[in-house]
Amino acid sequence: MFNILESESRMSEQENTITDECNIAFIVALKNAMNVINGKWKLAIVATMIKQPRRFNDIERLLQGITPRMISKELKELELNSVVMKIESIDPETGKKMAMYDLTESGRKLEGLMVQMATWGQMHRDDS
């Protein structure tokens, strides 16, 4: 398994040169992550669920400019990648089926990454 701390240590020891094995492991791990979160709306959808589970309509309301079709597509992909889970239940008021979406344990681990990305994004924009 790729260990970024080991590779950083190795890079400084080798005067910022990196071995082919480490470079490949890093790139594979990065591509794995990007395959899961890549897309215009995926991280925004995940962000809506950081504090609490959300209904489909909540996500649509919170993310102005996204179509219902795109929400559905992105949620399905996030479910397939075990980032989001769909929780179906019966609405006690109406007796109708309802669905909520919540983050899995793996999805919750994205919060720190998203905070770092948002911080970097703001600094990058301010520096430009």
Set out the residue ranges of the language-model regions.
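Short, polar/charged, Gly/Pro-enriched helix-capping and turn/loop motifs at alpha-helix termini
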Residues: 73, 85, 124-127
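Amphipathic alpha-helical dimerization/coiled-coil segments
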Residues: 2-18, 47, 102-128
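A short, conserved structural fragment
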Residues: 79-89
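N-terminal helix-turn-helix DNA-binding core of bacterial DNA-binding proteins
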Residues: 25-70, 76, 90-100
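Short, solvent-exposed charged binding patches
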Residues: 85, 100-101
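Generic structural signal for well-ordered, non-membrane alpha-helices
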Residues: 54, 76, 80, 112-115
